[in-house]
Amino acid sequence: MAAELTSTKLNAENHLLLDQPLLRLPHELARRNFKSVQRLVEREREYVIHALKEAANASLSNDQTPDQTLAALDSMLARMQNLKRKMESIQQEEKKIQNQSRKRIQHLEHLHQIPSLADVKYDQWSRIRLDRLVVDHMLRSGYTESAQRLAQEKGIEDLVDLDVFVQCQRIAQSLRRGETKDALRWCNENKAALKKSQFNLEFELRLQQYIEMLRTGDRGKLMDAMAHAKRYLTPYTETQSKEIHRAAGLLAFPQDTKAEPYKSMYSFDRWNHLSDLFIRTHHELLSLPSSPLLHIALSAGLSALKTPSCHSAYTSSSSNSLSTATSVCPICSTELNELARNMPYAHHAKSYVESDPIVLPNGRIYGQQRLLDMSKKLGCVETGKVKDPTTGEIFDESEMKKVYIM
């Protein structure tokens, strides 16, 4: 009895390992909002203090007329009003983030109030988490409208990162269309954070602009490309010298060249590379997992259940799908068999073998008594016959051979 209670006891901490991004992203967004406010206030403070000193000195020295002094004060007031509007907008965003964090903390707190895996409340909580994982997967796959509708239908808008992924997919799609404007604007907004990134997104975007100028073959564009490289590429000489040298060599090759690496640099496939690079950079800056959480959850479950027989020559999902009584093993199912193929096998320290194992002519091994009982329950075989519960094949009882394990 004690062992049974232990096996059904809910360990909330282990369950929450998968849900760390649920709180990490709002925290990261709140931190970025605070940094934005800090930069705005510092910039405007420096401007106003400097402008006040100039206006006061000019007024005392009679270098300005009263109208000019009033105009300077009006300019400062206008800037402060503009700062107020920006801070009000940021405050609204901050309230939204705080509300999301509150809802997410409440969702996670509910798990600590569930004592057992057998509790009906755990099924309800797990269903909400599954809905979250599905929405997350859909957002990452680009199905933003479907993800939004599912989140609204399930009432979990505050538990998923709709706005973040919608913006990410919008910019990624613009790059696939051959546009760099939105991505460069995003880089400018996150310039400070990008300095710590392991990826070189802004350099790659500027390099692509340079390539597009050369692609035209126009002499005027050639001069623009050289000026562009001097302004935007040369600051990266210390870290990207190899790529800059290649970019310089590109001046001597037309867009239809067969010479590498210039052929690859002119290739339109670079836009897909830039789109993928942006997504990786975006997720890194916001501390988002590189893989969908649904994949991570599935990988753990698949590895825990997978055995060598799931992908053996005698077991295939296609044969299972044709049988009237399919295997209960999820790894052997048509939906998950290929997905689990590259997963590691489960670590089984103990083996559990039937006390009366027999082997059928098709090579499958079962417990004799359990096989006979199942054949009787199915009620679709003649006397003296047995049915393989996995493949549906029928054999004579005399064809069963006893198995001895050494």
Curated annotation (Swiss-Prot):
What are the annotated GO cellular component locations? cytoplasm; GID complex; nucleus
Task: Give all residue intervals belonging to the CTLH domain.
Answer: 164-221
Domain of life where this protein originates: Eukaryota
- Which residues form the RING-Gid-type zinc fingers? 329-391
Query: Which GO MF terms does the UniProt record name?
Result: ubiquitin protein ligase activity; zinc ion binding
Q: Cellular location of this protein?
A: Cytoplasm; Nucleus
| GO annotation (BP), single | negative regulation of gluconeogenesis
Tell me where in this chain the LisH domain is found.
Answer: 126-158
Database matches in Pfam families: CTLH
Sorted keywords for this record are: Cytoplasm, Metal-binding, Nucleus, Zinc, Zinc-finger
Q: Which InterPro entries match?
A: CRA_dom, CTLH/CRA, CTLH_C, Fyv10_fam, LisH, ZF_RING_GID
Function of the protein: Involved in the proteasome-dependent degradation of fructose-1,6-bisphosphatase.
Q: Which family does it belong to?
A: Belongs to the FYV10 family.
Q: What is this protein called?
A: Protein fyv10
Q: Which source organism does the UniProt entry give? A: Neosartorya fischeri (strain ATCC 1020 / DSM 3700 / CBS 544.65 / FGSC A1164 / JCM 1740 / NRRL 181 / WB 181)
